[in-house]
Amino acid sequence: YKGVFTGVGGPCLITPNRLTLPDMLRKKGYETAMFGKWHIGLTAFDKKGKPINRNGLDAVREIDYSRKLEGGPLDRGFDHFFGTASCPTTDWLYAYVDGDRIPVPPTQIVDRGPLPKHPYSRDNRPGMIAPNFDLEEVDQVFLKKSLEFLERHKKQKPDKPFFLFHSMQAVHLPSFPGKDFKGKTDSGPHGDFIFEMDHIVGELTKALEAHGFADDTLVVFSSDNGPEVPTVINMRKTHKHDGARPWRGVKRDNWEGGHRVPFIARWPGKVKAGAISNQTICLTDLMATCAEIVDVKLPNDAAEDSYNFLPVLLGKDKGKQIREYTLHQTISLAMAIRRGSWKYLDHKGSGGSN
């Protein structure tokens, strides 16, 4: 996957013929949209039409921005996309992707001099930046796009179901909260960034309510990994806060703090407010769960690692584990397996960054 996570370095990790969640829902009549970071690879081309399958500043300079991108959200089941190829404030290409093109190409090297300097400002690589790309306001741009989609959908297709995937930069390092959120907390820049994330979720929730979608919409809030090393170390020192507590480990580890994340669901009339489950689920399980909700029988070559947790959401699982086992992997490709309350790590230590 060299290049996939750090720029327009394709190919996409999802193979072209594999059934995806948005593709499945689109076939059931849903309008599908994604706004935010894609981060699983898409392919750009140079002026000779050759694919650029690597990352770095030199690769970004070789891109022919007049050509379409391949392997992005529009090729994997989404009707609409506006966002970035990978982490918008981390990786070498600092420009927005609109559909399958980059309408405003990067024109200059990122000047990181004016950016905030604090323990949470690392992970901002040198790269090329577009004139309309403000490193501190990307999440507000993503929010604006999602809100516009909901408003447009209400006006144009009020009776058509929709699937919206809002993929935030917050709270991935570097912690660059928007100008309206700086100083909002007494927990420093990272606390302010968390505040901004909370604001975004609130604005999306209010929009669902304002347009009359809230009572018939399943909302899921989650994350893709545990907290980053600098946030844990520095927040422990300065604010007595530990984003992984009580679990050991951080992002990229096989210890539980590396992969155990929040999972919050809101579905009025279906999910009991305030209910808590001790089920072990994986984000891959969303595919089988949504298939059950929309009455789709998944083919054998789709979502092989996905388990239906709809009974858990509805409070009908009676405590029975839905997963036979769950696999985990670190940045160094070290593996671990979990079955019930037992865990086996095929390595010494965390296997990752800790």
Predicted regions mapped to residue ranges:
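Formylglycine-dependent sulfatase
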Residues: 1-353
